[in-house]
Amino acid sequence: MFLIPLGLLSLVLLATPGLANSPLTLRLTVQDHKVTASWQAPFPLSNYVLYYAPYPEMNPIQSVPLGELTRLSVELPYGAAYYVAVSGEDLYGQRHLSNITYFRIKKIWHPSPGTTWQWQLTDPIDLTVEAEMFDIDLFETPKEIIQALHQRGRIVICYFSAGTYEPWRPDAPLFPREIIGNPLKDWPEERWLDIRRLDLLAPLMEARLDLAVQKGCDGVEPDNVDAYQNKSGFPISDKDQLRYNRWLAQAAHQRGLSVGLKNDLDQIPELVDEFDWALNEECFSYEECEKLLPFIKAGKAVFGVEYELSREEFCPEANRMGFSFMKKHWELDAWQEPCW
C-alpha cells in the first residue's frame, strides 16, 4: 500500500494553510540518477511551489518556489528517496495541491542475455536451486524468504497480476466492480481488468509495487499485460495497452524496481526501451520467438519456459538465440529442466 500519504498530506496542509486538494497532476520519471517531475492542471495556475520530504520519515518538509515552471529535472545520488508534491495558485489566489508521490534512486537490475533463473510460484521455495534470479509470488512469499535468497546472492523478482482480478488476493476487496470484466479463458476464477481506468487501477497497482519495495524485491513481473488481445469485456485498444504498460514500467522504475515485459509479443518494438528484460511462455510451441529478438539486440535478457515440448525440441534453438529458457510444470513448482 502507499506509504502513509495521508500523514504527509496533513503535514503539507499544516505547513501551508488554506491549501486545497485538486486535479493538479504530478508525474515523475526516474532514469538512473535523473528524476524528472512534470505537472499540469485543467485550469490556469501559476506561482508553483515544490514540496519534498525524505522517504519514509516524511520530516522535515522543504518547499521551493518555482514560479511558472511546469517541469523540473535533477540528478541525485543512489540512495536518495523522497516524497514529492507541488501546488499552484489559481486566478483567485487559491492554492491547489497535486497528488503526493515518491521515488527512490537505486541501481536497477538490468540482466544481460544468458542470465540464469528460477520461476517458482508455489510454496515452499526451494532455496537450493542454482540460479542468478528467482521469480516468486509477491503476496505469498514471506519477507524472510526474500532475505534468505539475498543472503545467497540471488536477485529476487516478485510476481503479481497487473491485468486481472484475483479474488484470493488480500487486496481483492479494494477493486471496484466497474473495472472487473470477463473471466480468463483458462483461469475462470480470474477476471480481466479495465486497464483504461488508471484513475481507479493505478492506486491499486502502486500499492502492489510499494509492497514489493517493503518486502525487498529487486524487481517485479507484472502478468497479464495483453488484455487488448483477449475478450476482456472492455473495448481495450492496443494504444490503451501501450499506455498502461508504459505506466507500469515507469511506476516500477520510480521505486527503484527492475521490471520485465511478460508475453505481449506484438508490442515489443514499442516497449523494448521501457522494460529491463522480457519473460515469455511457449514461444517455441507457437513459433513466434523471433519477436523477442529486439530484447537480445538491446543487450537485455529474455527469460522463458516451455511446458509441453521436450528440452531437445527447444533448448538448442533457445541457446542459439541467446535466450534463458527452461522446461517447467504448469503449476510452476520448484522442478525445472534448464537449457543452460
Describe each region flagged by the PLM.
Residues 5-14:
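Bacterial N-terminal signal peptides
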Residues 16-20:
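Sec/Tat signal peptide C-region and signal peptidase I cleavage site
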Residues 21-44, 78, 91-106:
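Pro/Thr/Ser/Gly-rich low-complexity, intrinsically disordered linker/stalk tracts
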Residues 106-340:
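Glycan-processing catalytic domains of CAZymes
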